[in-house]
Amino acid sequence: MVVRDYNTELTYIERISTNSFRIKKGFQPNMNVEGIFYANSRLEKLMFDELRNSCRPGMTGGFLPGVKQIANVAALPGIVGRSVGLPDIHSGYGFAIGNMAAFDMSDPTSIVSPGGVGFDINCGVRLLRTNLFEKDVKPVQEQLAQSLFDHIPVGVGSKGIIPMNAHDLEEALEMGMDWSLREGYVWAEDKEHCEEYGRMLTADPSKVSMRAKKRGLPQLGTLGAGNHYAEIQVVEEIYDKYAASKMGIEELGQICVMIHSGSRGFGHQVATDALVEMEKAMKRDKIETNDRQLACARINSVEGQNYLKAMSAAANFAWVNRSSMTFLTRQAFAKQFNTTPDDLDMHVIYDVSHNVAKIEEHIVDGRPKQLLVHRKGSTRAFPPHHPLIPVDYQLTGQPVLVGGSMGTCSFVLTGTEKGMAETFGSTCHGAGRSLSRAKSRRNLDYRTSCGIWRRREFPSGWRRRSWSRRKHPIRTRTCVMWCRPVTTWASVPSASSCGRLR
C-alpha cells in the first residue's frame, strides 16, 4: 500500500459544513461508497491530529486512525449509502468506535463483520427514573453508594448472585428479557421500554461455543469493569418538557439511575470464536479487505448466519444482565429508603444497545430496502411514529441515552426523521476517548485523580485506583463536546435534545 504524506491525505477529505466532513473515494483502496464524519472544532482537531501522527515515519502498529477506519469500512462488499462516523468516534478494532454502516440484504456479496459490532456485544445503557430528589439522596449518598456496591458485583472476574444453572442459561440466551420476566426479575412494562423488547428472535444458543457459555454462566447480573457503571444521576436541565414528561421526567433535581454494561466475557468469546471462522470463510470465498481486523463473511453463508445467531444470543444475555442489575438496583434503593421499588416509582425509561448488527428496513435511493445495520459505539435513534418504538414514545421519537464520562453530564435525546434519512437512524453513544487505557495507566497519577473526584464529592467507595485513572477527565471527552453537534447543529441531525443529567 502506498504511504502518502499528510497534505496529500487531506486532499481526500472535504469539509461539507461547519461540523461534517466527506471522505472521498480513493482515500483508501477499493472504496464502494464515500465516508462521512461529524465533529465540532475540538473533535476535529483530535481526528486530524490522529491522522497526522499516522503519517510520520515509523508510526506503525495499534489501531488505524479513525478517519482511515471509516474509509476501510466504505470498501466492504455490499455497503450502501455511506460509512458514517458519529461525533464520539475514536479508533477501535476493525470499525472505529462510533462507526455505523449498512449492508444490502438482497446483495449476495454483502457481509457481516464482528468488528462492526465489537467484542462487548449489546453493550448498552438503561435509564430508570424515580420519584426521589437530590435533597432526599444527598444526606445518604455514601450509604446508597455502598448499598449499590453490596448488591451489584463489579470489576474484572466478578461473579453474579443471580441463581443460574446451565439449563437456565440456555433459556436466557434464547428468551432474553422474557426469561427475566418469567423468573420475576423485571416488571412486565420494562420489556416494552427496551430496544427489540429485550429479545432478539434470531438467537440460537446451539451456535454458541461451550467456552463462551462457561465464561458467561457466573457473570449474569454483574457490571464488569472498564467504562461500565451504575450511576445515580440528577436531572439538571430539561430542554423539551413534553418529551421529558412522556418519559416521567418532570422536575429538575429528580433522581435517575443509569446502568451501562453488556454481555461481559460471554459476548467477547462469541466474537473471538466468530473471527476464527470468518478468516477461513474469507479465504474460501476470496473476500479481500483493507484491514485484517475487518474479518467478515457473506451474510447468507454458514459462517455469517452462525455468527448472527450467536450474536443474537449474546445480545439476549446482555439484556438479561442489565435486567438483573435493574432488579438489584431496585433492591438497593428499597433497602436504603425502607420502602418498595414500586413506591419509589423506579420505572425503566428506556434501554438502548450500542454494539449490535440488526436487520432493519430503510429507504435507499427512494425505495425501501432490508439492510443489515452495524452499529458499533452507535445508538439507534428512530423517529416519531416508527413502528419499532413503544406506544408511549410514538409522538416524541425513541429515547436515546448518551452516557457521559465519570464526573460529567449525560444526555437523553430523541430520534428524528432527518437522522433516519442521513445516518440510518443512528447517533453517538457516549463520551469517547482521548487517551487509551494503557496510556492513562502510564501517564495519570492516582492521587491527582482521587483529588478530582473528592472535590466533585464522589462517594469514597467509587474512588478506586483503576477506575480513577480510567475515568480521568483528561482521558475521556465530555458529552457536551458532541451532544451539542448532535442536537443543535443542522449538519448533524440524528437526534434532538430532551434533557441533561449529571
UniProtKB/Swiss-Prot annotation:
One of its GO terms (biological process) is tRNA splicing, via endonucleolytic cleavage and ligation. GMP binds at residues 227-231, 354-355, 403-406, 410, 429-432. It is an enzyme of class 6 (ligase). InterPro entries: RtcB, RtcB-like_sf, RtcB_euk. Transmembrane segments: none annotated. Ligation probably proceeds through 3 nucleotidyl transfer steps, with 2',3'-cyclic phosphate termini being hydrolyzed to 3'-P termini in a step that precedes 3'-P activation with GMP. In the first nucleotidyl transfer step, RTCB reacts with GTP to form a covalent RTCB-histidine-GMP intermediate with release of PPi; in the second step, the GMP moiety is transferred to the RNA 3'-P; in the third step, the 5'-OH from the opposite RNA strand attacks the activated 3'-P to form a 3',5'-phosphodiester bond and release GMP. The lineage of its organism: Eukaryota, Metazoa, Ecdysozoa, Arthropoda, Hexapoda. This is RNA-splicing ligase RtcB homolog 2. It catalyses: a 3'-end 3'-phospho-ribonucleotide-RNA + a 5'-end dephospho-ribonucleoside-RNA + GTP = a ribonucleotidyl-ribonucleotide-RNA + GMP + diphosphate; a 3'-end 2',3'-cyclophospho-ribonucleotide-RNA + a 5'-end dephospho-ribonucleoside-RNA + GTP + H2O = a ribonucleotidyl-ribonucleotide-RNA + GMP + diphosphate + H(+). It comes from Culex quinquefasciatus.
